[in-house]
A protein has these predicted regions:
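Proteins that catalyze or organize thiol-disulfide redox chemistry
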Residues: 1-181
Length: 181
């Protein structure tokens, strides 16, 4: 056994991986942007609070399946205004939407919409099929060229929090190390 294996044995998981929480973005626009940057399909689970609570439980087993884990991003939304304006396709208010982001993560296309009560096997099959199609039809991005092209086209992404660090403790982001204001 390797040294890493011996160390890992001391830190075994306490619960079942199928019950692990499903990662969720703070808002759909950020999720769509990150999915585009990571070149992944994003799964939008939408509905009212009660529906979302139930969906989190059922989606967990699928999202943590060995064939699925790490291949998708997820977002849970109760307010349809956060996503209806930037998506094309079936915009039913509640359901599981499999979405392909555009090149710059500004918009997305709903490629399949399923009811929230979809059985795990059917959902898993739909996800794997969507991912297979996405991988075959999406050109790999070169980060530097992608950012350059986006800037030329005037596409900008503003994060809710400024980039940088407050090194001098004045409450403002220091733009460049070593430069005085």
């Amino acid at each position: 056994m390797s040294a890493f294996g011996e160390i890992a044995d001391d830190y075994r998981a306490k619960g079942k991986s199928e019950a692990a929480a499903v990662p969720d973005f703070p808002n759909f626009r950020l999720g769509l942007n990150v999915a585009s940057a990571d070149q992944r399909v994003i799964i939008l689970i939408s509905g009212n609070e009660k529906e979302i609570k139930e969906a989190r439980k059922s989606i967990s087993a699928v999202s943590n399946d060995p064939e699925i884990i790490g291949r998708f991003h997820y977002d849970f939304e109760t307010d349809p205004k956060t996503w209806t304006g930037i998506l094309t396709g079936n915009k039913s208010k509640s359901g599981i939407k499999i979405i392909v982001p555009d090149t710059y993560g500004q918009k997305g296309k709903i490629v399949e919409s399923l009811p929230l009560e979809t059985k795990a096997e059917k959902l898993k099959t739909a996800l794997l099929k969507a991912n297979e199609t996405f991988v075959k039809t999406t050109e790999k991005k070169n980060y530097q060229n992608h950012v350059q092209e986006g800037r030329r086209k005037g596409i900008k992404w503003t994060m809710p929090m400024e980039f940088g660090e407050d090194r001098d403790g004045d409450g403002k982001i220091d733009r460049r190390a070593g430069r005085r204001r």
